[in-house]
Amino acid sequence: NLKVLEDSADIIGAKYKGQPTGNFADISITSFYGMHVINCAGNGGMITTSNIEYANKAKLLRSWGRSSSLFNDAEAIENRFNVKIDDIDYDAKFIFEKIGYNLEPSELGSAFGIVQFNKLDKILDHRKKVYHELSNFFLKYEKWIDLPKKNNHADTAWFAFPFFIKENAPFKRRDLMIFFENHNIQTRVVFTGNILRQPGYKNIKCIGAADDFVNADRVMRGGILLA
């Protein structure tokens, strides 16, 4: 009965063994944040599932937990004024079945996203072109950096260009990032790195300590993304 949630936030359009990412789980999420493969005027996201029960629950939670979010015609009189709460006549538009959120997409963002989606193939081709150009450029510096190696089964969307600074490099990551930024090349570290070292997670109870996750530490100390 294990349920799988797939984080496909950064990689819409990517495939593994010919199957689209997001197709390997009960529920998958995709992000439309500003620097991701496509965006909805700077923000937004999507949950996808083939399970109608999960889809309805997601719609419910998205819209304050209101049951009217599941109606095809929420304004119809026969839907609205034929319900009671504790013997009180009520409006079905304002019955809250769950404690939910206000995460409904805007029409502007949706319109922006549709245009972006229609250009997805062109966007993916451009990102792959940039990946090959950057790979060829940085090959001359392999003595000091580790370049990304693509899995043979993967067709990658290249949300960004990642690499690691080796410990023997004659420069620090901080200095390289400042150099790039001063030349209008946007950089970022690899998100949280070892999340157990982040201030907000210091007191989280988990299996193992921060020092146990050596690969996460390597990412945190030496990882760079070129956006």
Residue ranges of each PLM-predicted region?
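Conserved active-site segment immediately N-terminal to the catalytic lysine
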Residues: 5-41, 56, 94-95
